[in-house]
Structure formats: C-alpha cells, structure tokens
C-alpha cells in the first residue's frame, strides 16, 4: 500500500489474503488507498442453497450481509415466495444435515444460513470445538468438514508439491473461462461501465447499523466506471449481530495490535477469540501467545524487543484467610442469608 500511495494512489486494491477482515481493518487504519476484500463465500454458498432447494441460482432473489466468513443470507426468495421454510425443513433431515452440520445447527438455533463451510464456521464460534463430545458430534467430517488443522495441512501439501515450480511457465498462455471469483468482473465493470453486482468487504460506514463503524463488513455492492458503491442493509437480526460481534472484537484488536506492535493488545485479541476463550484460561492464553510470539518473531518485526508480560498464578492455599475489607454487595447478601439461616 505504501508503494501504491506513491505510484498509483487512485488505483483500487483488491485483496484476497486472509484473515480478510483483520487485514481490511488494518488497511483502513494504515492507508487512504481504496480497497475491497474479495471472497467466494457468497456465490459458492448460493450454488449450494440452490441445489438444496431445487432452484436455479439465477432465479433466487437474495440478500447476504455480515462479516467475512460469517455473512448471513438474510433473504432467500423466488418470485416473491420465501424459500427459507423449505430450506429449514430440509436441514431437519439427517441425510442433509450430515453434509453441513455446523452451518445447519447454527441455522436451526439462530434462524439463518451463513456463507462459510462448517469446518471454518466451527473456528469462529464457541459451541462446536470446545471439547471432544462437541468435536465428535459436529466436526467428524473429513477435511474442511471439521478436521483439526485441515487448512494448514492442505496448504502445506500444496506448498511442498509446487515449491520448485516456476509459476509463469507453469500456467498455460490460453485464457481459461472465468471462475467464480469476482476480480475480473470488477475490473471489467470499472473499465467498461458494465455494472457488476457482488458482495465485497469494506470498512463499515453505517452499512450495517448494528455493527461498529470502522470494522470490516461484507455487504452487497456494485461496481461501475465510477468505482465501488457499497449498499446499506440496515440492522442485522440481533442474534446475528451478536455472533458477528464476537469476531469483530477480535479483528479490531488484532489489527491494532499488528499496527502498533503491542503484545498486550495481541494477547487481548486472542483472549477475545470465542473458541480460545471456550477452552483456555487467561493464564493459558497468555502463555500460548507468549510462546507463539517468540516462535514467529522473525516474521513480526514490529514486535522487535517487545515481549508479553509474564503473570504467574497467585497461590491461595486451603485455609488462607482474606484480609478484612468492606463486603461486596453480592457477598453482603450472601452474608445476610447466612445470618438468617443461623437464626
């Protein structure tokens, strides 16, 4: 982005790099370069939904909005008829539910389907990976269906397979048909004024009213020769905003920690993570972050010379008497109950 500020300050940066939301927030904090984050979650999930309900995706009128990897299909209609009742009924059938357990269970409890695979979604919420029972119930499918470390092992395998490849000579010169990714369509729209509608990731400026301004949201928008035009969707259903906000807090903290090189903010970001906090104590989280920071320091120059504070467990052996202090109001009530019980 620094190079773009010098060489092409009005050009659009299209980002595909994860973590999409945290990266986007960081870009918004660090630079004035216009950017959009592009993902394939909405369009590929629409294909999936169309198959489930037996409709052509071109015939489905939909609105999707939220945050990257956790946007919600707020509307699913065909010719004005709501497709959600049929879709929800389908996911009550075991032969369908087994294909997408985490997304299906989330929809069953909160009412809406979201845009990321079950394996990915299980990483963003505190409900599905917190213990072995939950893993066996919801994350028992191979690969991205829930297997631990699936994304890492897949990327590592590809990196090893192609580490000696010259990519410029590896790819054929012939143009292949367009994929489901948005990038070339956005470029075409901006160069030819052929309007293209899609979902993109941008800094929230009231586009989703019940998520904080300054976070990264994934909302409907269109591109034309004048640029990008994000659309406001109003308020998400409150339960969906609650689920999004769990990870928005992590993303805001992570971006600020990265830009400032602040180990304590880094710890706070990890401590705020819903899955981490579901399985670890604060002391365990602090020790883990300290270890990870040391192991990855060579790639994190902004943390040079900085370390996380060490906080040991304060011992409170059996029989230890606390000092005399004014009673906390809640403890005072308990104390009063005790007196009443003794009388």
PLM-predicted stretches and their roles:
Residues 33-53:
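Acidic, His- and aromatic-enriched active-site or binding-groove loops in soluble protein domains
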Residues 1-5, 50, 187:
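Generic structural signal for well-ordered alpha-helical scaffold segments
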Residues 51-340:
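Long, compositionally biased stretches enriched for glycine and/or charged residues
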Residues 13-17, 37-39, 198-199:
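A structural signal for short, well-ordered beta-strand segments and their strand-loop junctions
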Residues 18-21, 40-41, 65-67:
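An acidic- and aromatic-residue-enriched active-site/binding cleft used to recognize and process polar
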Residues 29-35, 80-81:
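A glycine- and small-aliphatic-rich helix-loop capping segment at beta-alpha/alpha-beta transitions
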Residues 25-29, 48-49, 74-76:
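Short acidic, glycine/serine/threonine-rich loops at helix termini
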Residues 1-31:
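Rossmann-fold NAD(P)-binding glycine/threonine-rich loop
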């Amino acid at each position: 982005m620094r190079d773009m500020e010098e060489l092409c300050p009005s050009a659009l940066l299209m980002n595909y790099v994860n973590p999409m939301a945290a990266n986007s927030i960081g870009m918004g904090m660090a630079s004035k370069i216009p950017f959009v984050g592009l993902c394939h979650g909405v369009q590929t999930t629409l294909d999936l939904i169309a198959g489930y309900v037996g409709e052509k995706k071109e015939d489905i009128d939909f609105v999707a909005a939220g945050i990257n990897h956790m946007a919600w299909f707020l509307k699913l209609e065909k010719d004005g008829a709501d497709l959600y009742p049929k879709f929800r009924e389908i996911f009550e059938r075991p032969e369908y539910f087994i294909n997408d357990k985490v997304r299906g269970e989330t929809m069953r409890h909160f009412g809406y389907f979201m845009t990321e695979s079950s394996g990915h979604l299980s990483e963003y919420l505190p409900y599905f990976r917190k213990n072995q029972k939950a893993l066996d119930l919801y994350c028992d499918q191979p690969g991205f269906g829930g297997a631990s470390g699936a994304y890492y092992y897949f990327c590592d395998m590809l990196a090893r397979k192609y580490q000696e490849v010259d990519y410029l000579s590896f790819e054929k010169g012939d143009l292949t048909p367009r994929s489901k990714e948005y990038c070339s369509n956005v470029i075409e729209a901006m160069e030819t004024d052929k309007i293209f509608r899609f979902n993109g990731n941008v800094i929230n400026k009231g586009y989703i009213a019940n998520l904080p301004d300054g976070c990264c949201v994934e909302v409907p928008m269109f591109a034309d020769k004048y640029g990008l035009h994000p659309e406001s969707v109003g308020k998400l259903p409150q339960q969906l905003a609650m689920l999004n906000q769990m990870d928005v807090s992590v993303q805001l903290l992570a971006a600020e920690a990265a830009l400032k090189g602040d180990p304590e903010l880094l710890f706070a970001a990890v401590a705020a993570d819903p899955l981490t906090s579901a399985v670890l104590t604060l002391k365990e989280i602090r020790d883990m972050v300290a270890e990870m920071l040391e192991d990855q320091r060579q790639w994190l120059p902004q943390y040079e010379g900085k370390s996380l504070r060490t906080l040991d467990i304060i011992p409170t052996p059996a029989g230890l008497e606390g000092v005399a202090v004014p009673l906390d109001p809640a403890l005072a009530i308990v104390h009063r109950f005790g007196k009443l019980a003794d009388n």
